[in-house]
Amino acid sequence: QAIEEQLSRYRDYKPREWDDGSDAARHQKYIEELPAVIEHALAGLREAMARENRILGEIELLDMLPGLALPHNTRPDYNRRGDLKTKWSSPDRRAKSGFKAAAIPKSLTGMFDMKNVFQAAGFWALNGRQPPFLVYASASNYQIFTPENCDELKDDFLADVVEEIKVQHRCTENLLQAAETKEQLLGMVAPDFKNIIWNEPPGYLAEAKRVWGLA
């Protein structure tokens, strides 16, 4: 019943209209995949937290990392230390269906999955170094990563990642201290409008380009 409720809510979603129908096509495909993704996510989460006395949902962790002026902020999905990552089919013109099935990573060494390790390192740094877990779920299967089966989630690796996070934060702090205005701050960084983070409505992009003097 819970799955049907979520499926009904997703059917009511109104796809965006400014991306040549890409969002609408994904919406239809994901209506098919959603029940299986939910089932695999539930199975993975039950297995990952089988020894827990209770299950805690998303919380905000906001605390200082040594040597920084501003706090680190992160939001673990479950029990202060775990996160769920869902994987979905992606458009592929070469496939007969028009979509390529989602692939669950076999390790966390890839560029995109390493970003999730950085996220887990933030949990670990702020929750008393509790061992993190990541659950990946798709329409076909699921995979659980823990310190027991993944070197990237072990304490020594996470400690190194936290040091990298601190370097990134320190650079951001230096920029904030050097800039007296928003315009000065934006002038210190170069935007990459091909990056997925800029997948925004045309009006939003037009304003951003205007601010950077590109329009």
Go through the PLM ranges and name each one.
Residues 61-117:
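Non-catalytic protein-protein interaction segments used by genome-maintenance enzymes to assemble
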